[in-house]
Amino acid sequence: YTEVDTLSLHDALPISSPWQGVLAIMLALYLVFAHVDDVVRRARAYGQGFFTGLRKLGRAYWGMVSAHCGLAVMVAGITLVSFHEVERDIRMGPGDRASIGEYAFVFDSLDNYQGPNFDSTRGHFQVSYQGEPVVILHPEKRTYHASGQIMTEAAIDAGFWRDLYVAMGEPLDDGNAWAVRIYFKPGIRWIWLGSLIMAFG
């Protein structure tokens, strides 16, 4: 494979981001642990056993705890995405490889297929982490029959700690290469998880 782009996660970040990110994460953790400590103290204050005390804390109190802990999780997610997200626009063709940190993206091949109401050019990207296979992503460029509109369908590998995205832009060199956009988004799911926890509160 031909290496067309290599970027370490450290080089992709602003100089100030590590300290700001660490501070935000520490504040989020402090908020969670402070509420855990408060729950334990209040439950024990009833003097009737820890689990009995938990049941007596009341819905309003649990709602407040859930809302604040959800906020902490959401802040942690926003911090990770804001300071550690990486986006790369790269010229790639079949056989090319690009790396972001320990993740390698290999443009393996292209094929064409016909959907129910569109024609598609589909890419096949092998993704590995520290040399171990992770997933094969299949971004598409679709042309819809009725309108003639061309749409980009990004391929996503979603995970608890990070999401990986690959999207195909415009063909280059008569289709021998493509403008490819690769995203590394850490903690993006934490934003939705935190919002969900807050909603329960």
Language model features by range: what are they?
Residues L7-G201:
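Solvent-exposed, non-transmembrane regions of integral membrane proteins
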Residues Y1-T6:
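Short, exposed "boundary/linker" segments that immediately precede the start
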